[in-house]
């Protein structure tokens, strides 16, 4: 069976596309968009981006009729169990209407579906950020009004975990892993028998601080800051995600620039970089407790995993937990293609949005 797949990953100002023959990437391109093109509602952006994608594919003389399937990055949807989902009408409406939030990634499934319909081939999404496999115990907090949510780098965390499993000849569903994705945001997940049973919410201010996110903060001081009239609601949210972390302290979220400053003797930059590594190590150690200390491997991934300085600082604090594997970067296009390939090869069953299990129905034992 043919396995020629178009992958689409929309960002805030660009759209990355790729063509895969099975697991081999044969084409990739990043399409940049003007501020006007991405400044309107999702419905307007959908039309503009779709035409840009089709124009580029035509210019590259890519035969769309040879495609088997199309897959887009998953957006903000209702909480889902991990897997590859067919884009259906209910998903389309939730993405387009922003039912669970508006984000550029919502366009991934929409673009895949629109192009797929014209070619009469299926459209999918794979492991969106709202993948939710938390155990009931992991949801509880000290206030009944507040429940922890699962929002993390599900696509890359799942992809590297399954890649590790395949390379070692062990089913992912039989492994106990800790995966730390380190990029603009940082999420650390405990993977038990194929499910992420605990992970910090990388969007709403949990866990380690990162280049542009605050991470967990002292609650009392945060409450006082919220009521100080110094900041409005949207400004506070921006401090937590977008303007927090390293950029708040150093004025840049560029890790290469920060390491250059450290090499030049910047003690403040050195301390903050070490502090970020310290916080990541604490998150990893916490997730090892979730797994009762029985950890097959710790995987460091994401763009920051390219940094020898950062990973060494983390590894020095967690070497006792288990073997440490570095899989740097976040090849999202490949991860999307791999999700579809597993369905085409019947290694996994495609899931239907709207028919997924709730977290209570999907819970399992930690032991």
Swiss-Prot record:
Catalysis: reaction(s): butanoate + ATP = butanoyl phosphate + ADP
Q: Does Acyltransferase count among this protein's keywords? A: no
Q: Where is the signal peptide?
A: none
Query: GO molecular function terms here?
Result: acetate kinase activity; ATP binding; butyrate kinase activity
Q: Name one GO biological process term.
A: acetate metabolic process
What PROSITE patterns does this protein map onto?
A: ACETATE_KINASE_1, ACETATE_KINASE_2
Q: What InterPro entries would the database entry show?
A: Aliphatic_acid_kin_short-chain (IPR000890), Aliphatic_acid_kinase_CS (IPR023865), ATPase_NBD (IPR043129), Butyrate_kin (IPR011245)
* Entries under Pfam families matching the protein: Acetate_kinase (PF00871)
Q: What is its EC number?
A: 2.7.2.7
Write out the annotated subcellular location.
Cytoplasm
Q: Keywords on this record? A: ATP-binding, Cytoplasm, Kinase, Nucleotide-binding, Transferase
The answer to whether the entry has keyword Cell membrane is no
Provide one Gene Ontology cellular component.
cytoplasm
Family, per the entry?
Belongs to the acetokinase family.
Q: Which NCBIfam families match?
A: butyr_kinase (TIGR02707), PRK03011.1-5 (NF002834)
Which PANTHER family does the record associate with it? ACETATE KINASE, BUTYRATE KINASE 2-RELATED
User: What is this protein's name?
Assistant: Probable butyrate kinase
Quote the gene name from the UniProt entry: buk
